[in-house]
């Protein structure tokens, strides 16, 4: 078993502080295959994958002064998709359970994770491992030369890279005062309900358009969201700035294998 327990990092504390039933801080990543999912083989793939990612085989607890993760021998099991997407994972009725779930529907495998555990990139790598190990059981001959996405050691995956690379510096002078940003308006859903919209885009075409404009995919999608917000703004409020929060994957800038949270945001 990996390290028995460790404190959550500073970024994870934000998700713990803002976790509610309206916004349970759960994200989903899915993979759709070309054939129906075999639940027994998917469960076998999860049993193979879990030891490869010990940093995700944890439960979350509230200590006297801080939250902490504790390693567990629980093994993940898949279930048919029977809840709304991104249903809460860190709630009293799920105490002492893994803070991620794997479900399936037709030919699709869904991975949902509590955001204090990792970010989208860490979840994506975890799902790739699950899918790779599942396909190795379904099509062993075709998959025998396909390596697992996780090539780092358990120690490298668990190290807190914030401690290694962050250097505290004091700001010189006061931060500039920013004007109040525009706030979206609309009818609120009941407290414990979420609403989802599903869209399908060609990654190749969207990337080509972003590169044509000389920007990254994240910048292009962020700008598209801002334009959509602007189109809904009342004319009298269009002088207000539109502010959105974009995550930054620091793995692109630092040599780390850390799979917990490395996503400060920019406005």
Residue ranges with predicted function:
Residues 252:
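Conserved helix-loop functional segments at active or binding sites
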Residues 240-242, 261:
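Secreted, luminal/periplasmic, and some membrane-associated catalytic domains
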């Amino acid at each position: 078993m990996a390290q028995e327990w460790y404190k959550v990092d500073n970024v994870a504390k934000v998700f713990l502080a803002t976790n509610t039933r309206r916004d349970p801080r759960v994200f989903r990543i899915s993979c759709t295959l070309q054939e129906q999912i075999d639940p027994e083989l998917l469960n076998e793939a999860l049993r193979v994958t879990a030891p490869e990612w010990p940093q995700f085989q944890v439960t979350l607890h509230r200590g006297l002064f801080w939250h902490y993760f504790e390693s567990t021998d629980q093994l993940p099991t898949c279930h048919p998709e029977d809840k709304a997407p991104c249903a809460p994972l860190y709630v009293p009725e799920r105490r002492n359970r893994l803070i991620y779930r794997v479900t399936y529907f037709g030919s699709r495998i869904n991975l949902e994770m509590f955001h204090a555990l990792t970010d989208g990139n860490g979840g994506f790598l975890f799902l790739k491992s699950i899918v790779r190990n599942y396909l190795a059981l379904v099509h062993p001959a075709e998959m025998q030369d396909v390596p697992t996405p996780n090539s780092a050691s358990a120690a490298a995956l668990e190290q807190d890279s914030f401690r290694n690379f962050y250097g505290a510096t004091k700001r010189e002078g006061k931060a500039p005062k920013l004007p109040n940003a525009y706030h979206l308006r609309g009818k609120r859903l009941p407290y414990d309900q979420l609403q989802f919209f599903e869209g399908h885009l060609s990654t190749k075409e969207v990337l080509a358009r972003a590169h044509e404009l000389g920007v990254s995919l994240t910048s292009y999608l962020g700008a598209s969201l801002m334009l959509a917000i602007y189109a809904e703004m009342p004319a009298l409020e269009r002088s207000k700035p539109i502010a959105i929060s974009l995550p930054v994957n620091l793995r692109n800038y630092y040599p780390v294998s850390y799979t917990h949270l490395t996503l400060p945001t920019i406005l």
